[in-house]
């Protein structure tokens, strides 16, 4: 899921290095299952490969389903059920006490940005500039463009 990124936050609860452990890159299954979730903000399509989430999009959003393989099929799986449970908690105003495992096969930079977003505490936000600052620190660079972060966030399939 893409957190809102409009205000500064306090120190993150977990580092993006810790969040990286949640992001799996190895392929477990070639079968991708999808399901629909009716959220208060609109219909969400959830995709997973049996071991991890691979996509989560509001229907009709830009890049909707861009990472879905042609053979994706509607179905049920424990991964999709776990994502539904997380969304139920989130949209009911309760802090989920777990984070579904996600498979995010992308560039190293986009994975770092995703890890930083996962470190944003529940109910808080972070600016693209702050995410860029943290990503630059992780990459050993002096600075990084907030626009590059915006591109990474926009292409995040979850």
For each feature predicted by the language model, list its residue ranges.
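Low-complexity, small/basic-enriched stretches
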Residues: 2-14, 19-98
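Nucleic acid-binding interface residues in structured DNA/RNA-binding domains
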Residues: 32-43, 94-158
């Amino acid at each position: 899921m893409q957190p809102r990124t409009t205000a500064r936050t306090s120190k993150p609860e977990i580092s993006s290095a810790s969040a990286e452990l949640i992001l799996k890159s190895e392929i477990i299954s070639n079968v991708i299952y999808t399901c629909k979730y009716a959220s208060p903000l609109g219909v969400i399509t959830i995709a997973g490969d049996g071991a991890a989430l691979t996509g989560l999009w509001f229907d009709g959003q830009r890049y909707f389903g861009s990472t879905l393989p042609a053979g994706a099929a509607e179905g049920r799986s424990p991964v999709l059920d776990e994502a539904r449970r997380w969304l139920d908690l989130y949209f009911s105003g309760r802090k989920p006490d777990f984070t579904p495992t996600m498979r995010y096969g992308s560039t190293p930079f986009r994975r770092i940005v995703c890890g930083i977003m996962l470190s944003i505490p529940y109910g808080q936000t972070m600016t693209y500039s702050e995410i860029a600052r943290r990503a630059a620190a992780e990459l050993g660079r002096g600075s990084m463009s907030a626009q590059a972060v915006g591109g990474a966030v926009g292409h995040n399939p979850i």
